[in-house]
Every structure is written in structure tokens, then in C-alpha cells.
Amino acid sequence: MTLNNLQLFAHKKGGGSTSNGRDSQAKRLGAKAADGQTVTGGSILYRQRGTHIYPGVNVGRGGDDTLFAKVEGVVRFERKGRDKKQVSVYPIAK
């Protein structure tokens, strides 16, 4: 009497797993107002992480380094020294 050792194999491999397949949402950083644009007080001018652009005249900096207008006026992106940039808001003369 012979004993047959019959072994069955799966015809499809298991699903497995991976450590990839995720991505964080975009943070929508960057300029929110263009050079020469008229803005109102409190308007966001530039969203950033760190100080890529510094606040100039009539511009404040929020806790997350967001730059915002303090007064109504015209936006100007300017150079600050040789290697820095700043954004200012100049009031419109009435």
C-alpha cells in the first residue's frame, strides 16, 4: 500500500502589505497677493514656513510666519539687502 503525499498550492498569491501608499495634503503655501495689487487690512499676503520673505512696511507676521497687511494699500515685493526679500504695503494717497 502506497501513501501519496498530495500538497495543494494556492493559485493566487496573498495580498501582502506595503509601507508606502500615503501622502500628506498640500499646504497651499506661497504668495496670496501679487505685486501692485490693492489689499485691505488683515489680508494674507504670503503663507510660508520659516521666513523666506520678511515683513516690511505695514506688514505683520503671524505665529506660523504668515505675512498679512496691517493697512489698506498697494502690495510691493522688495529686496532687503543683497540676499533677502520683504513685502510691504503702501497706503493709497487720497
UniProtKB/Swiss-Prot annotation:
Originating gene: rpmA
GO molecular function term, any single one: structural constituent of ribosome
NCBIfam families from the UniProt entry: L27 (TIGR00062)
Residue span of region Disordered: 9-33
UniProt entry keywords in alphabetical sequence: Ribonucleoprotein, Ribosomal protein
One cellular component term from this protein's GO annotations in UniProt: cytosolic large ribosomal subunit
Source superkingdom: Bacteria
Prodomain positions: 1-9
Any GO BP: translation
PANTHER family: LARGE RIBOSOMAL SUBUNIT PROTEIN BL27M (PTHR15893:SF0), RIBOSOMAL PROTEIN L27 (PTHR15893)
Record's keyword annotation contains RNA-binding: no
UniProt similarity note: Belongs to the bacterial ribosomal protein bL27 family.
InterPro entries registered for this protein in UniProt: Ribosomal_bL27, Ribosomal_bL27_CS
Pfam families, sorted: Ribosomal_L27
UniProt PTM comment: The N-terminus is cleaved by ribosomal processing cysteine protease Prp.
Name of the protein: Large ribosomal subunit protein bL27
